[in-house]
């Protein structure tokens, strides 16, 4: 909205509508929730991140700090008998998955590699079943978080942009938003434990907010197509 105002558009009477992902056809939404050997599955979303978009020279140190925090969190998950399913949002994130696994091995020495699931996702159609197979999602990419919510998954968002914080707030999950620029493994673990503990209470809230967003988009489509 601020950008539109800046280039001369009048936006005072314009309504802001939810992301179009909320209107995904029901046929695309899988309803699968499998546990690996009875263990709970955590969808862990990774992304290439080297600092705020406004920073002219991205920092490798910033990226490594982000990655090392994820590795420490993953080490805690493995120590507490969780299965980790890596999630990506762009093709370029596959290199992050590889580096993550390398750092995890360096950190832990040996671990049960069957408890780290890393499958390619080259499309939304491939990504959706991967998210559906998780019990809880901890993710960085906006659309990993958004798709998890559409699938009614309790989420911790590692927020790299104000749009992530806004989404979590709109979904009633503001307390489960973790600022990527101030990552703290201990606090991330606490947020994860809280979201897991409250998962059954959160799911109806998420479902209701998603349905509200879907109805808002229906309204938007009606307004658009009536004017054509």
Model-based region annotation:
Residues 1-228:
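Active-site anion-handling motifs in enzyme catalytic cores
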């Amino acid at each position: 909205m601020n950008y539109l105002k800046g280039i001369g558009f009048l936006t005072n009477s314009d309504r802001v509508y939810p992301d179009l992902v909320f209107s995904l056809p029901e046929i695309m939404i899988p309803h699968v929730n499998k546990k690996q050997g009875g263990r709970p599955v955590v969808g862990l979303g990774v992304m290439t991140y080297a600092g705020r978009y406004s920073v002219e020279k991205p920092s490798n140190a910033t990226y490594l700090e982000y990655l090392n925090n994820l590795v420490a969190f993953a080490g805690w998950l493995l120590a507490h008998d969780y299965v980790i399913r890596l999630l990506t949002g762009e093709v370029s994130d596959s290199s992050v998955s590889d580096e993550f696994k390398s750092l995890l091995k360096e950190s832990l020495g040996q671990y049960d590699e069957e408890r780290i699931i890393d499958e390619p996702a080259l499309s939304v159609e491939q990504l959706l079943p991967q998210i559906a197979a998780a019990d809880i999602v901890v993710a960085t990419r906006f659309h990993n978080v958004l798709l998890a919510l559409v699938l009614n998954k309790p989420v911790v968002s590692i927020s790299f942009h104000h749009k992530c914080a806004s989404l979590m707030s709109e979904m009633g999950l503001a307390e489960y938003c973790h600022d990527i620029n101030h990552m703290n493994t201990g606090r991330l673990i606490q947020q994860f434990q809280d979201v897991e503990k409250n998962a059954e209470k959160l799911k109806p809230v998420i479902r209701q907010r998603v349905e509200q967003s879907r109805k808002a988009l229906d309204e938007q489509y009606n307004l658009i197509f009536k004017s054509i």
